[in-house]
Amino acid sequence: MKIPNIGNVMNKFEILGVVGEGAYGVVLKCRHKETHEIVAIKKFKDSEENEEVKETTLRELKMLRTLKQENIVELKEAFRRRGKLYLVFEYVEKNMLELLEEMPNGVPPEKVKSYIYQLIKAIHWCHKNDIVHRDIKPENLLISHNDVLKLCDFGFARNLSEGNNANYTEYVATRWYRSPELLLGAPYGKSVDMWSVGCILGELSDGQPLFPGESEIDQLFTIQKVLGPLPSEQMKLFYSNPRFHGLRFPAVNHPQSLERRYLGILNSVLLDLMKNLLKLDPADRYLTEQCLNHPTFQTQRLLDRSPSRSAKRKPYHVESSTLSNRNQAGKSTALQSHHRSNSKDIQNLSVGLPRADEGLPANESFLNGNLAGASLSPLHTKTYQASSQPGSTSKDLTNNNIPHLLSPKEAKSKTEFDFNIDPKPSEGPGTKYLKSNSRSQQNRHSFMESSQSKAGTLQPNEKQSRHSYIDTIPQSSRSPSYRTKAKSHGALSDSKSVSNLSEARAQIAEPSTSRYFPSSCLDLNSPTSPTPTRHSDTRTLLSPSGRNNRNEGTLDSRRTTTRHSKTMEELKLPEHMDSSHSHSLSAPHESFSYGLGYTSPFSSQQRPHRHSMYVTRDKVRAKGLDGSLSIGQGMAARANSLQLLSPQPGEQLPPEMTVARSSVKETSREGTSSFHTRQKSEGGVYHDPHSDDGTAPKENRHLYNDPVPRRVGSFYRVPSPRPDNSFHENNVSTRVSSLPSESSSGTNHSKRQPAFDPWKSPENISHSEQLKEKEKQGFFRSMKKKKKKSQTVPNSDSPDLLTLQKSIHSASTPSSRPKEWRPEKISDLQTQSQPLKSLRKLLHLSSASNHPASSDPRFQPLTAQQTKNSFSEIRIHPLSQASGGSSNIRQEPAPKGRPALQLPGQMDPGWHVSSVTRSATEGPSYSEQLGAKSGPNGHPYNRTNRSRMPNLNDLKETAL
């Protein structure tokens, strides 16, 4: 492994720009001055002086020399200059992070499958060679112009020769894509890479990161919010890990579930693959061989046969001599090598084109296993070639990239695989394709080599091939490698055994959760409403950041908002998932227990931007964030619940909370059916609620009529009554003052409680924490005063809270009023958050003389207003009671007719002031109260006022 120490090598290249920077150096885009080939040169800093950097760079160099495969970035050469190591790679146009930024709502399903299939093939090749990547994430997945995916950055890769479950370094893998065993410091193996694949599958599908935790413990909490509790073995590891000393394990009783999260986004087959990739117990997690033979990849396996051959060559494109069999390939490698930037695939032996045509038979030579074998053998070591020659060679080389194994050891392993495959391939007609056929061949029906693939593939593959094209999976992952993988899988699977139970639990809870906790699925937003449209619309609409962005009208602005919203979103998300579930179910405490103010007990409420770890992604991600968070995929939902539960994220959180709550109320009040409809249309539905602005009165009536608790999911979704489809934006109203204003306008009705938050959202956003505290205190006092004054006033206080709680608890409540109110408020606040303040002040003045006083410290004015305007406020509250159906006690004081009579704006003013103050102060307290409350409609409001959650407690007491 000698690295030439050539001082003038860099003189051969013209530097075109900087592709990226990392901890170990910089990546430059360069053009070879003679061949004009575009390459990426990774320049390590201080390779000689820094032992850690040196070890990492040499490890990466060794791995890359060993791993030659079509879906692994090609190392062209390595050299030293002035004590620094330079690695010359093929240039690939972009990475998946940038792709997700371009497509914030996710990638089309067929492309998702294609990318995941290629990624699994690359990982399969790594695992076949006992290498675990350990840092699989979107920015380490390069995507060429013709959609060929290449795995790069092996700086954290590790050789598992010591054993699959050796206890390696814990701090590897970007947090969001880190498996539970890595987070807990448990022994791990190849299954850690499979977990990352599952996370990326979800992210590609809806544009949002699946588990965006902001710390190790928050990551565990975020994972459990979706997948359910960890196995008991992992729980023990948590308590025995000194890193988590003194922390309570972040248990979640009502997980969202992958089904609900990706309802209407992923089909059942792909969802099954994802669930098996995201098994909490690594022993139960699918490994590459099982994935490649999964029914969802039938088409890919079939296409892979011919393209995989081309792909094989591509891996060998290094020498394109192999491809020289197709002289065009050899020539194009030389000529197109400069075009690499344009088409790396082509460069790679100009197999790029055939490869691009993976779906196609690819090269004629590839179509004939013979050509593939011949072309492949020249490219790589003959040892490798020989092993692949047996019949599956060509396919193995092409599909399995066996020829990529330049090292004799790799050739050996490849040979072994080939042999394994060969015997089976002999079964199939085209032994030469065996390896590549292992997948493609596995489908005897699908391609000429399907029988081979069947023979060359693992038994499961064969079975699958019989049934479908599943067997084709092995194409790029050689069937032998699959077999080998199977062996390694066995070793890996030995490590854990509890995940099944936990998963079963999670799944069981998930269905119910979907029903009862759409809010947690907010994102998903409610399995009931999920629709394909929701997937696309929701992404843009649902993400809180997305909404805010919409308000701002830019992805960039979104990005800024994304940070805020992200923080809020994150807060929201975990809580959203958890609290919403807990709200709708009987376990509000759990969500509260962790998220009173946090998305999770461990969240700082400032979730990293979509990819905080990626500078580039963060910027672009703003879009993605919108989409991802907005989808209600859990991020937005989480953020919403958190915001509702706590004002911790500072200024933004309270408004967000308010908005989310108001939307919840609105949604629940609007009418279950209408809510479901909206949820289903996710984007369009929310548009409807937005368009419903004028229908607030009706919705108020609906609220009366529909005391049934709305789904939490719907409650979270409703926050986006805007036509923008920025449902999450409303939830994330804190991000954009306009959102809060929207909420406020929506909250003009008594149910619109969040409106107050939006009011103060402009102010509170700037200094929401202070306002919150003041408002909380003032509101608390006002609540007490109201209680003392008369039950009517307390009733007015509690209706908001109750309504909110009701809406939250009654995710399925079919009261449409909240939505309607919200649209009005939204229309008002959307236009002007600040003006809304003044307007509201005016409205409050008209409805309650004291309301205007509470413009800034809404809560304090509310206090006065509530006490002074107990009648008007009470009236409003009765309305809200009737509408909410949760404040039945209050409803006594105010007839239901009153809501109909009252204008949404009028009712909201007095009602809103108190409710807003509550929502702002209650954000967190609300969640607590929800947890404390026993029922959505008939909660005992006996709780004493809490300084932290004065609004909710006061409301409860007043209701009592």
Swiss-Prot record:
Residue ranges under compositional bias (Polar residues)? 319-336, 382-402, 434-462, 473-482, 510-548, 728-748, 791-816, 862-872, 880-890, 914-928
Q: Which domain of life is it from?
A: Eukaryota
Offer one example of a GO biological process linked to this entry: modulation of chemical synaptic transmission
In terms of SUPFAM superfamilies, this protein maps to: Protein kinase-like (PK-like) (SSF56112)
Q: Kindly state the tissue distribution recorded for this protein.
A: Expressed in brain, lung, kidney, prostate, ovary, placenta, pancreas and testis.
Q: Name where it's found.
A: Nucleus; Cytoplasm, Cytoskeleton, Cilium basal body; Cytoplasm, Cytoskeleton, Microtubule organizing center, Centrosome
Location (main, coarse): nucleus
- Which amino acids does the record list as binding ATP? V19, G20, E21, G22, A23, Y24, G25, V26, V27, K42
Residue ranges with Basic and acidic residues bias: 407-417, 549-559, 679-704, 769-778, 817-827
Result for mutant: R858C: In DEE2; uncertain significance
Cited InterPro entries: CDK (IPR050108), Kinase-like_dom_sf (IPR011009), Prot_kinase_dom (IPR000719), Protein_kinase_ATP_BS (IPR017441), Ser/Thr_kinase_AS (IPR008271)
Changing H145Y has the effect of: In DEE2; uncertain significance
- Give yes or no: UniProt keyword Phosphoprotein: yes
Reaction equations catalysed:
L-seryl-[protein] + ATP = O-phospho-L-seryl-[protein] + ADP + H(+); L-threonyl-[protein] + ATP = O-phospho-L-threonyl-[protein] + ADP + H(+)
Sites of Phosphoserine modification: S407, S479, S720, S761
Does Isomerase count among this protein's keywords?
Answer: no
What UniProt keywords apply to this chain's record, in alphabetical order? Answer: ATP-binding, Cell projection, Chromosomal rearrangement, Cytoplasm, Cytoskeleton, Disease variant, Epilepsy, Intellectual disability, Kinase, Nucleotide-binding, Nucleus, Phosphoprotein, Serine/threonine-protein kinase, Transferase
Q: Name one GO cellular component term.
A: centrosome
Q: How is it modified after translation?
A: Autophosphorylated.
- Which positions are catalytic residues? D135
Q: Where does this protein have coiled-coil stretches?
A: none
Q: Which family does the entry's similarity section mention?
A: Belongs to the protein kinase superfamily. CMGC Ser/Thr protein kinase family. CDC2/CDKX subfamily.
Q: Subunit arrangement?
A: Interacts with MECP2.
* Protein name per UniProt: Cyclin-dependent kinase-like 5
